[in-house]
């Protein structure tokens, strides 16, 4: 875990994670803060040699579970290409893993305004490009 932030108000709590490999720190943070209304986690630009700094999509969903997330917004997957996977692969794997456990998720397009306190949405915008 390189850096992360918890933003908390009287009504809501958000976790913003930076680049991170999957490990026990997510469960520790989830235990400390009980739950998060939204977690923003990296998913993309992964490779076996980068496992300590970038999670694969299924690990991102597992981290969201460990954090007791009510909604997941996976980021770090659609703007730059550093890894050899197709650029849309991370989000499609996120969707599959999140839907398997009924975890609400967002798939906002770059530059799109996200109203995260509303119902989560999973528009497949990349398929329309």
Regions found by a protein language model. Give the residues of each.
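Cap/insert and terminal regions of metallo-dependent hydrolase folds
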Residues: 13, 21-110
């Amino acid at each position: 875990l390189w850096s992360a932030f918890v933003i908390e108000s009287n009504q809501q709590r958000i976790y913003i994670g930076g680049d991170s490999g999957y490990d026990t720190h997510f469960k520790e943070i989830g235990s400390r803060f009980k739950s998060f209304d939204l977690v923003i986690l990296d998913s993309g630009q992964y490779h076996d040699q980068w496992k300590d700094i970038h999670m694969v999509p299924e690990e991102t969903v597992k981290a969201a579970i460990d954090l007791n997330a009510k909604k997941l917004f996976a980021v770090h997957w659609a703007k730059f290409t550093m890894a050899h996977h197709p650029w849309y692969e991370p989000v499609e794997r996120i969707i599959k893993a999140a839907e398997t456990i009924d975890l609400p998720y967002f798939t906002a397009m770059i530059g799109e305004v996200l109203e995260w306190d509303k119902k989560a949405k999973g528009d497949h915008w990349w398929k329309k490009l």
